[in-house]
């Protein structure tokens, strides 16, 4: 009987873990789709601006969409130990291989989180498996996601500078 209880608990734990993985994968797909849409809009605006510039023979300014180009040199958002590295990893209990598309850095709750580079905030809010999250588009197809925050310090559409406080660490 005790064995059945332990087995049932293990099965429930596995189901919970698999649900969390599915939620993170869905959130990741949501971020990817949002960034692709933003890149397509940026390309269309750039093409329209180039066409307008040709017809006006260089008079006036091209279109802008609150773009901030990052440097491409990412800084660390927080100072701490990497608790979960990028890439494939084996779940410590179930032995299943899962892909981790980022890194987790262990810090105390409330630690200020800094933008790794300049850019535009394209998401600031609750994002499923990432909890309270911020996504920054740095341009040239580069973006960063900062998840599991206790508090957010920036709004969607806001331009941010490298090193600017964007959130505070949590465990959401």
Please state what every model-predicted region is.
Residues 1-67:
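Alpha-helical oligomerization segments with coiled-coil/rod-like character
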Residues 68-172:
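Catalytic cores of peptidoglycan-degrading enzymes
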